[in-house]
Amino acid sequence: MYNEIFGIASFIVTFALMVLMYRCFGKQGLIAWVAIGTIIANIQVIKAVHIFGITATLGNVMFASIYLATDILNDIYGRKVAKRAVWLGFSSTLVMIIVMQMSLHFIPAPVDNAQNSLKMIFDLVPRIAIGSIIAYIIGQHIDVFIFSMIKKIFSSDKTFFIRAYGSTILSSIIDTGLFVSIAFIGTMPGTAVFEIF
């Protein structure tokens, strides 16, 4: 029950922080949220938890907030700005992976206590990193595209949530399916992979 309560709290806090970034910094706040959120979600996805009767990786809530941020950018500032935010999220993840991999190759000082912990978190299995990057790019571009298509049908301000939820649900399913397939198939039992999906 703890994970469920904490999961709901995490959901509320994550989306409240995204709204706060938007309120304080406008368009730039949402673009920054995409970059920050992508890095956070790619670190969170390493941890598996049991929640609501299933095994899931963390990062799903953060990724959902990223989808909403790109939907808001797409709705208010246009598809071009949303796509730039997607590429910024990809670039920030790539920079994080490269810099942290380089950091791991330094020989630690005899008094260092961080190397093993950093190695455990950032010595990403190539499949996970590749799966994450491929799923992110494809999922986000599909989200931006679907949102734009739905907006042609439901264009009023009152129908934003139809556009946002419609595009996010479809693109999240594709994103998760791609990520789980690339990162985990063949590395864990099929039932565990199915639960994560």
Q: Where do the language-model regions lie?
A:
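Transmembrane alpha-helix/helix-exit interface in multi-pass inner-membrane proteins
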Residues: W87, S91-V111, S132, Y136-Q140
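Hydrophobic transmembrane alpha-helices
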Residues: M1-L73, K80
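Extracellular/periplasmic helix-loop-helix junctions in multi-pass membrane proteins
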Residues: F179-F197
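Membrane-interface interhelical connector segments
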Residues: M102-R127
